């Protein structure tokens, strides 16, 4: 990046003065950075920190509610996941979009099932890359409203489908485009709005809403399964209009991202946004300090010119590593195998002899939703790295039991092996499926979004998050499409495949994912600039908070062999 930048004039002030070397470094700026402000940055930082420490918890209610409203975008995604798993087993849906057997009953072939379930993910991948640009151009709020409208268009096409499966298929692609944009813009707006000490928890609310949507989707399927007509699936789809209207209305009360406003030179609006989210006046030291930090960071990024897609590979500091990390984390989140249960949970538990597999899916949904509340605590108390690592260990253990019981005691081709089939074994598998979902919901489910939302500088954030999210959707498509074929071929041995992925994920997180707990987005950038080793990153301290004896070199090198460094 360039070591020079132009003078910046702060709104509401006609004076300029230079910031000394230490102050410039604190702001993440080059030494000759000039800013417009009445107070020295050192004094502002001290005053702002004192103000924040004295703020009662109730002062964060408004910004928390705003972030929860934005996180409701996750509910839209979860609702689709929870309902589609039931649709593919409902009689009216099978009659309209399936194929007829010789006995007059209807079924969905593996190909058609895979396409209907998984094509949504392809739409999401494209929407995440293409439609998320609306947020960079017109703002995060306008971007979210736009993609919600696209989502509704897709829902209308699905509801209007009568007996042509490809019409329903097209509707799922279009609704996927909208949800793909939501999955990028929602965590992005939350991470840019939330106070740093609450950011992990509030970004995790996005995953909480996903689990809430999955749970209510399961419940709605259970409530409509006894109907014999299109009420079975059209009512759950029709409820999507209510969710869309609720979110659009909510966007009217959510302040725009201050970082976006500063980037588009709307300084006064940024000041108002910061004041609104912090529940203070626009002249408060907290607003002045946060605005100055954002300005200095963005001015530095603008000095290097507009970000290109190629900068995700060639950019500094460590942009290729950070881009690859986002792709890997989002890919591995899918390779945990969660959608194996969520997309096909009803089908799976039919195969193990459960009397009402819809009820079993509701149990999984309850565990998933309840566990995510625990994640709101763990993400900011145990750190991102530790949660991901512990999650890998827990899920590996669950898959060992789940798959081993499945391949030794249960056979999907039950009549061929009636002597070794066991309903008790099926119950055991459900228990460990619940343990697995607890491990997933408290670790990888929310933290994957937290990690990518706070790993990139603003200049490339939209593009980097879009690429990372696209990798998640592509793997979601592959798992959703091929799961019917794989389970038909290897049955419950499939669990060992996901177990192997989690073993790989453990080592990847340990060696390549740094700890970002408690850091501002600008401080994360500074950590990457200093080349801190990921397994030592939890000990890293930003330059603005270091003592005289702080040794950053010790965090950049490790003389121990890798296997000792892990212990």
From Swiss-Prot:
Extracellular side: 84-113, 163-167, 221-234, 355-358, 408-429, 488-493
Database matches in InterPro entries: MFS_dom (IPR020846), MFS_sugar_transport-like (IPR005828), MFS_Sugar_Transporters (IPR050360), MFS_trans_sf (IPR036259), Sugar/inositol_transpt (IPR003663), Sugar_transporter_CS (IPR005829)
UniProt keyword Transport, yes or no: yes
GO molecular function: carbohydrate:proton symporter activity; D-glucose transmembrane transporter activity
TM stretches of this protein: 63-83, 114-134, 142-162, 168-188, 200-220, 235-255, 335-354, 359-379, 387-407, 430-450, 467-487, 494-514
Polar residues biased stretches: 1-24
Region annotated Disordered, chain positions: 1-36
Family: Belongs to the major facilitator superfamily. Sugar transporter (TC 2.A.1.1) family.
Listed name of the protein: Low-affinity glucose transporter
Lineage: Eukaryota, Fungi, Dikarya, Ascomycota, Saccharomycotina
Gene from which this protein is expressed: RAG1
């Amino acid at each position: 990046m360039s070591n020079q930048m132009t003078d910046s004039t702060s709104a509401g002030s006609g004076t300029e003065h230079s910031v000394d070397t230490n102050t410039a470094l604190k702001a993440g700026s080059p030494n000759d950075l000039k800013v417009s402000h009445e107070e020295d940055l050192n004094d502002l930082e001290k005053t702002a920190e004192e103000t924040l420490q004295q703020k009662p918890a109730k002062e964060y209610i408004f910004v928390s509610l705003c972030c929860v409203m934005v996180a409701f975008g996750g509910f839209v995604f979860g609702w689709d996941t929870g309902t589609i798993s039931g649709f593919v087993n409902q009689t009216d849906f099978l009659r309209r979009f399936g194929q007829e057997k010789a006995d007059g009953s209807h079924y969905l072939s593996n190909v058609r099932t895979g396409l209907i379930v998984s094509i949504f993910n392809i739409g999401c991948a494209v929407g995440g890359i293409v439609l998320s640009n609306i947020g960079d151009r017109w703002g995060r709020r306008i971007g979210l409203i736009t993609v919600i409208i696209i989502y509704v268009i897709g829902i209308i096409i699905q509801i209007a489908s009568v007996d042509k499966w490809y019409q329903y298929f097209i509707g799922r692609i279009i609704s996927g485009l909208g949800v793909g944009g939501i999955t990028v813009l929602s965590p992005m707006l939350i991470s840019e709005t939330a106070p740093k000490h609450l950011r992990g928890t509030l970004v995790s609310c996005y995953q909480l809403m996903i689990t809430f949507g999955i749970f209510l989707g399961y419940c709605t399927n259970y409530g409509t399964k006894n109907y014999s007509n299109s009420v079975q699936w059209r009512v759950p789809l029709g409820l999507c209009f209510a969710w869309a209207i609720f979110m659009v209305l909510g966007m009217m009360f959510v302040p725009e991202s201050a970082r976006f406003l500063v980037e588009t030179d709307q300084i006064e609006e940024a000041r108002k946004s910061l004041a609104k989210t912090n529940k203070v006046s626009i002249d408060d030291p907290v607003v002045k300090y946060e605005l100055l930090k954002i300005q200095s960071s963005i001015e530095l990024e603008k000095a290097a010119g507009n970000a290109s897609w190629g900068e995700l590979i060639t950019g500094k500091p460590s942009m290729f590593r950070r881009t690859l990390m986002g792709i890997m984390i989002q890919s591995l989140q899918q390779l945990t195998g969660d959608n194996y249960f969520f997309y096909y949970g009803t089908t799976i538990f039919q195969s193990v002899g459960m009397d009402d597999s819809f009820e079993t899916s509701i149990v999984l949904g309850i565990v998933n939703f309840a566990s995510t509340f625990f994640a709101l605590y763990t993400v900011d108390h145990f750190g991102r790295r530790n949660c991901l690592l512990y999650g890998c260990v827990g899920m590996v253990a669950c898959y060992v039991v789940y798959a081993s019981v499945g391949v030794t005691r249960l056979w999907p081709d039950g009549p061929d092996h009636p002597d070794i089939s066991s309903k008790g074994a099926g119950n055991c598998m459900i228990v460990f499926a619940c343990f697995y979902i607890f491990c997933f919901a408290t670790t990888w489910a929310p933290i994957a979004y937290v990690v990518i939302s706070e790993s990139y500088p603003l200049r490339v954030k939209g593009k980097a998050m879009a690429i990372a999210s696209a990798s998640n959707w592509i793997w979601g498509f592959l798992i959703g499409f091929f799961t019917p074929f794989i389970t038909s071929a290897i049955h419950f041995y499939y669990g060992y495949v996901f177990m192997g992925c989690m073993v790989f994920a453990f080592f990847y997180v340990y060696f390549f994912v740094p700890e970002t707990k408690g850091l501002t987005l600008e401080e994360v950038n500074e950590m990457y600039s200093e080349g801190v080793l990921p397994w030592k990153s939890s000990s890293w301290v930003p330059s603005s908070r270091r003592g005289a004896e702080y040794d950053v070199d010790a965090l950049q090198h490790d003389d121990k062999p890798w296997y000792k460094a892990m212990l």
